[in-house]
Amino acid sequence: MPKIIEAVYENGVFKPLQKVDLKEGERVKIKLELKVEPIDLGEPVSVEEIKKIRDGTWMSS
């Protein structure tokens, strides 16, 4: 059964932030999901503007 835990990546190693019930040497699959904070742009941004930024065409206007 999948279990979600938080971990920190330091010196090339994922370090769990809580106790993990695993045997030494046991293999697991890790799905990475970066924790990000929202950016306050100070004003509303349209979907079209977001698409331009995503597509890299925002500098051409």
From Swiss-Prot:
SUPFAM superfamilies: AF2212/PG0164-like. Transmembrane segments: none annotated. It holds the Pfam family AF2212-like. Keywords: Toxin-antitoxin system. Possibly the antitoxin component of a type II toxin-antitoxin (TA) system. Its cognate toxin is VapC21 (Potential). Belongs to the UPF0165 family. This is Putative antitoxin VapB21. It comes from Archaeoglobus fulgidus (strain ATCC 49558 / DSM 4304 / JCM 9628 / NBRC 100126 / VC-16). The gene is vapB21.
